[in-house]
Amino acid sequence: SAYTYSYTALGESIAWVVGWSLVLEYSLVVSTVAVGWSGYFVGFLQWLGVGLPQALIAGPHAGGIVNLPAVAITFLVAGLLMAGTKESATLNAVLVVLKIIALGVFVAIALPAFNSANLQPFMPYGFSKAMGPDGIERGVMAAAAIIFFAFYGFDAISTAAEETKNPGRDLSIGIVGSMIGCTLIYVLVALAAVGAMSFTVFGKSPEPLALILRELGHGKAALVIGAVAIIALPTVLLAFLYGQSRIFFVMSRDGLLPRGLSKVNARTGTPVAITLFTAVLVAALAG
């Protein structure tokens, strides 16, 4: 990982800064995705006729008390990681395939409804980043900064080096291959979404892809997309919680954190204490 490289090449002080920067980065990613998952989960429950109190589906900053679904999914994924790397990796692979199929279905339905008028004006807020009267930054550069958020996961792959049979080959294929594949998927999904509906409409929804399909008259497909998001979106949490806990683990082993946190469970072969600590930290941010 970037931490290990910094520790080896630049020294302990730089590695300490890089390590905590990665921890902050991963914490923000996991908490954000957990809140996004909560939006799909709550929407799915509402479709089933089940409503949750506003106080339990939003944090204090959004007028609630705690985002209970976001906190629950964080601890659920952490529990899976504590059960063992092999088990979590197998489930992750299955869910990723399911997620790719769902995105393929979305593109197949939304792309035929493509309306070029939705792309006009092509850059409605201009190229440079600018602050709007509502306090929200807009523009191509502001959007680019947000899109980089989607590429954080490629660094997380390198945190699995010690648990990989052939890291020299496998990590290279994993990082480059997934970056190419994900970029193509991102472009296709974004093109299909913006072409099918104005971004000003679905951009405000907590479940944008499902909303687009419903508006196109594909209610059942929207339900499937929502269900798949609920089932498969935790793969992002899985990857980043794994990466974050392993960074904590290595920092602990290197003496930059209490060494007791680097203890590995004899039965599962996983750092249970540091994984639980990571989950508590992320759940506090998400909730």
Regions found by a protein language model. Give the residues of each.
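Alpha-helical transmembrane segments of multipass membrane proteins
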Residues: A78-G79, V107, A190-L191, I230, ...
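Hydrophobic transmembrane alpha-helices that form the core helical bundles
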Residues: S1-T74, G79, I230-V250
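Helix-loop-helix junctions that connect adjacent transmembrane segments
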Residues: G49-L68, V97-A227
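Membrane-water interface regions at transmembrane-helix termini and the short interhelical loops
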Residues: V17, S21, A72-L98, E162-E163, ...
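Select transmembrane alpha-helical segments in multipass membrane proteins
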Residues: G11-L24, P69-I73, G132-I147, R214-L238, ...
